[in-house]
Amino acid sequence: GLKDLENYSGDESSYISSNGLRFAYGTFGNKSNPAIILVAGLYNQMVRWPTEFCHDLAARNFFVIRFDNRDIGLSNWMTGLKAPSLVRQMLKYRFGLPVDVPYTLDDMAADTVGILDGLSVKKAHFVGMSMGGMICQIAAARYPDRALSLTSIMSTSGTFGKGKPSLKASMQMLKKPSKGQSRIDNSVEILQFLGSPGYPVSDSVVRAMVELEYARGSNPAGYLRQMAAINTAPNRVHLLNSLKIPALII
């Protein structure tokens, strides 16, 4: 589902208002079909859901929606909000001290539901990866009348000590470009490190995706704000226990 990226150019984004912000989005398929809304992960843009994959879902009689989260890509960047110190915030949160974050995962769940409102979609299958899985968990639980199902991919419930990256993976994710290395080369290296050895993706495909995201809009301060929302999010187990819809964990 990624091979089309090597030959992909341009962007099919439209724009929609939600929760007081402007979001870039794209749709596939007939609007009369059941909707799927795809929510991307931390610092990821909607193109992480490959166009070919979206067309495949549409061919299975779904109306597919993908979009850029706030603070990334072609959606509004929260430039008026200070980029936080992640270390300081995590220490405060762990010791039960008040933490001021620019926005929360609940805000991003409201963004997601607001996009459905803007498209006049009453209900949707919520599908999210990584941070997007967290957002979909909240959206499905907080807005139960809008959710047909939940699919949470490579994500977590927020339970302390569960679903956390290894120290080696954490250090790799924070790795800055080495001397003479471009930001794109560094990003390709990080993504290949994090990728599954069981489902390898060629460097050329990963590079095409990274180059596309950089061309659309890379926002390092947005990464810090999104990460702050993740790091300070409360445990979602009680929310997940309230779900009355089909749920798939991948």
Summary of predicted features, one role per range:
Residues G128-G132, C136:
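Gly/Ala-rich beta-loop-alpha elbow adjacent to hydrolase catalytic centers
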Residues Y93-P102, D106-A124:
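Conserved acidic catalytic loop of the alpha/beta-hydrolase fold
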Residues Q137, A141, L150-K179:
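Flexible "cap/lid" loop of the alpha/beta hydrolase fold
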Residues L2-R22:
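N-terminal cap/lid segment of alpha/beta-hydrolase-fold proteins
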Residues N19-F95:
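Conserved HGGG/HGGXW glycine-rich cap/lid loop of the alpha/beta-hydrolase fold
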